[in-house]
């Protein structure tokens, strides 16, 4: 499973990990994400991971995954009251911290007093990170997909530029308007484009974004529709992503989840996202025949 990850980027690792991915420039990032026949799948951790008692969207969660296998990550930038960009999914603090109320009603100084909770609701030692901290941690280790929450696009574009992170950060877009903003701001940007109908891809092509700067987020489960879209994307040399987080991750047993993950890969999908990336990565590496 790991061959494509290592062949498309430079690597720094010990015999048993960590499994770091380093992209020298944007061309290396494009090559990593490009579709090629027989390419092994890319594992993407959704908000890092929820495994090993670790809280989502924490630096510790990201690092844990890379100790086990190479992976990339989807994370969630969100604004504080005083306009600090943090990495945090929910609009409220209650589910994933020992705080309460809306994130936007708290300053960064106030949020630093809180601790993150894991998936079982247990308070951990880990703190909410800023996006700047995650950028600095990720450099030379992995690639980051930035979801869209409440941060203005210009602020996201500016912080990517400030940290010289264009060669390891991917912008997720759900509209041609957002894609146009990011592309005009930085023509070398890597995009993850989310759409569910084949005809919805055409407006992005009309923007002039090179297809080698795109991968496609096409759903949360496999179907005849995703098969159709994935086949179309392959024709452009574009990988397609399925997110198992809201679907297959919810299956009751590890065996059921493993079988579902394998079916996603067997359908031809070449990026798969999960709340449990280590479990998923091991499942698709150890295919049953």
What are these regions (language model features)?
Residues 1-5:
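Bacterial N-terminal signal peptides
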Residues 8-289:
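Phosphate-group recognition and catalysis centered on beta-loop-alpha active-site segments
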């Amino acid at each position: 499973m790991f061959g494509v990850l290592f062949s498309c980027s430079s690597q720094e690792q010990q015999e048993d990990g960590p499994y770091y991915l380093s992209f020298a420039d944007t061309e290396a990032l494009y090559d990593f994400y490009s579709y090629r026949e027989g390419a092994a799948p890319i594992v993407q951790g959704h908000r890092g991971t929820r495994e090993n008692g670790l809280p989502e969207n924490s630096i510790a969660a990201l690092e844990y995954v890379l100790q086990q296998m190479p992976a990339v990550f989807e994370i969630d930038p969100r604004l504080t009251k005083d306009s600090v960009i943090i990495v945090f999914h929910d609009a409220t603090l209650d589910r994933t911290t020992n705080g309460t109320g809306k994130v936007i009603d708290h300053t960064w100084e106030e949020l630093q007093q809180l601790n993150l909770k894991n998936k079982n609701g247990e308070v951990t030692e880990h703190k909410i990170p800023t996006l700047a901290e995650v950028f600095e941690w990720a450099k030379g280790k992995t690639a980051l997909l930035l979801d869209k929450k409440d941060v203005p696009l210009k602020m996201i574009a500016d912080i990517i530029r400030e940290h010289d992170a264009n060669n390891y950060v991917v912008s997720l877009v759900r509209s041609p308007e957002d894609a146009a903003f990011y592309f005009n701001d930085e023509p070398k940007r890597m995009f993850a484009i989310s759409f569910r109908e084949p005809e919805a891809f055409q407006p992005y092509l009309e923007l002039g974004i090179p297809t080698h700067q795109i991968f496609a987020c096409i759903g949360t489960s496999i179907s005849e529709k995703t098969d159709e879209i994935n086949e179309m994307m392959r024709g452009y040399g574009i990988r397609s992503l399925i997110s198992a987080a809201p679907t297959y991750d919810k299956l009751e047993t590890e065996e059921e989840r493993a079988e579902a993950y394998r079916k996603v890969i067997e359908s031809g999908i070449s990026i798969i996202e999960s709340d449990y990336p280590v479990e998923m990565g091991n499942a698709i590496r150890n295919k049953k025949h």
